[in-house]
Amino acid sequence: MSELLKITLPDGSVREVAPGSTPADIAAAIGPGLAKAALAAKVDGELVDLTRPFTADAQLALVTAKDEAEALDLARHDYAHVLAEAVQALFPGTQITFGPSTDDGFYYDFAPKDRPFTDEDLPAIEAEMRKIIAANKPLRREVWSREQLISRWKQQGESFKAEWAAELPENEELTVYWSGDDWLDMCRGPHLPSTGKLDPNAFKLTRVSGAYWRGDQKNAMLSRVYGTGWLNKKQLDAHLTRLEEAAKRDHRKLGNEMDLFHLQQEAHGSVFWHPKGYLIWRELEAYMRRAIDGAGYREVKTPQVMDARQWEQSGHWGKYRENMFVIPDEVPNVDDEGPIVSNDADWMALKPMNCPAHVLIFRQGIKSYRELPLRLYENGCCHRNEPHGALHGLMRVRQFTQDDAHIFCREDQIVSEVQAFCELADRIYKHFGFTYSIKLALRPEKRFGTEEMWDKAERELRDAVVRAGLATEEYGWEELPGEGAFYAPKLEWHLTDAIGRTWQVGTIQSDRVLPERLDASYIGEDGEKHRPVMLHRAIFGSYERFIGILIEHFAGRLPVWLAPVQAVVATIVSDADDYARDALAKLKAAGIRADTDLRNEKINYKVREHSLQKVPYLLVVGKREAEEGTVAIRILGEQHQKVMPLDEAIALLKGEATAPDLRA
């Protein structure tokens, strides 16, 4: 008789079971309620199916809907599989590829037999998914050999799956999941016990888009079907409400209504800033300059185009070449027939980042340890060759400007420099009214440098956050294994906006690799050469994306100091035109960005129009206001108005129109 296995539960109690028993067996032994509620299990910390047999003593925690993070991920994963099964039932001959869960749902990529899918197909697919859920089909895991898997996929005409399976290691354990006895997919799992564990009213298919197989535009174009999935209808409804609110706040929509910027096909991924939008940019740029000047940074400007050999030396060519705009260093490089590239031409690249150029500035002249830290700042314009399908308004562009800085310092200065940056970022984000969380992204699997170097770099960032008093639950402190850059760990700032979304913006990274690769050095107190440590840091991330976040966070109602037009003097009657012009002159003299609206239109029409433009203050004047030297102030979003002397109104506006760092 086999020796019983000891399974330890979260409360410390131990259950003895026979080898081959499963978490589902233990759930049933505890009680029918738990057996029904259990969705999956954590065995020694690993999330597994309820039917996975025990082979040794283990720690067991049963996962139910109360474990929301795990339960949601399981549900979304299963919704993706049900989606694939439904599509193949409705559209025979469609090939399946892959479909992961996402932050708020799932998607699956398909190769349709006859035509690409469209949004019009979604209702029918949803209905078929609900049939599969209602059938309560058991989800069963099996381990297959690579040959068995390839044979199956070829037999079914699944060329994409067969291609993928053929590249898997021969000795890797490969798993498939059956849905009932008539449909299967290749998947690592885990999954829910059956399709009936999904709520048929807690998902919605949202859209269809194109996607290239393996993300390579040289490959076949697939149809990607997106969906959102939740544990119950209440969660789904709340999410859809958030989506509706997000649509109202969409920076592309508001940017058009407010006449801030536009994008067009002739310059994919590059922004055409209109006067009002560029004014916001200039205000942010001036604000950031004051902040970095006060923190001891020195502003620089570096070239847009550099020799490919520089990028090879820095390591970016090998890691990042596919995302760089590369051009031949040859004149002429184009004629009537098209591009000219000779075998003798060198290659140049538009910079995708500023860091190598800042190292080249540091290397000019001999540096002493007394000159460190040296903080170099640049509003650096960069270019990255992002796929067309990945571009999204201001949030994902090809040309962008970073509030980029690099701090060259000694080993003994790292913690204090990172701490100072943490405190600077804290002040800046609070000026914009954001709450945020801080994450420490730890070493990735593929990386430069030694283990000792990474140990030290991670410890320094952690210590700096602790010293700044930010490594607390209040600031959402969290460590993220595997999320660091290939050359350094990093701290990340995740802003929370008005509707609860998070945006990763600021970063700081300690880097010992690039100074080594580009031969940066300083003379130490001992008279010998030493390598500086390079701290890469940004607060806005990019001006484009930060402006997009601000527009959506404030729903276009920007703080008065950032509003392109801060006040409009609108007349009720033409008799007040001269008074309106005098009021405008006084507003401008006080440094307030103002305009007049003297059109022969009803005041309600003017109010509505300037509200759409998100003008913070409307100063309404008629014959009475002109005689008394007053204005009727109407604040954006409020129904009532308040009458006050013009001078008082100007004083009020001047206070709010002043940037927060300049207020007394």
Curated annotation (Swiss-Prot):
At the top level, the lineage of the source is Bacteria
- Residues binding Zn(2+), per UniProt: C355, H406, H536
Pfam families per UniProt: HGTP_anticodon (PF03129), TGS (PF02824), tRNA-synt_2b (PF00587), tRNA_SAD (PF07973)
Q: Does the keyword Metal-binding apply?
A: yes
Query: Gene name?
Result: thrS
Q: How does it assemble?
A: Homodimer.
Its EC number(s): 6.1.1.3
- Transmembrane ranges, per UniProt, are none
Cell compartment(s), UniProt: Cytoplasm
Which protein are we looking at?
Threonine--tRNA ligase
- Which Gene Ontology terms cover its molecular function? ATP binding; metal ion binding; threonine-tRNA ligase activity; tRNA binding
Q: Which organism is it from?
A: Novosphingobium aromaticivorans (strain ATCC 700278 / DSM 12444 / CCUG 56034 / CIP 105152 / NBRC 16084 / F199)
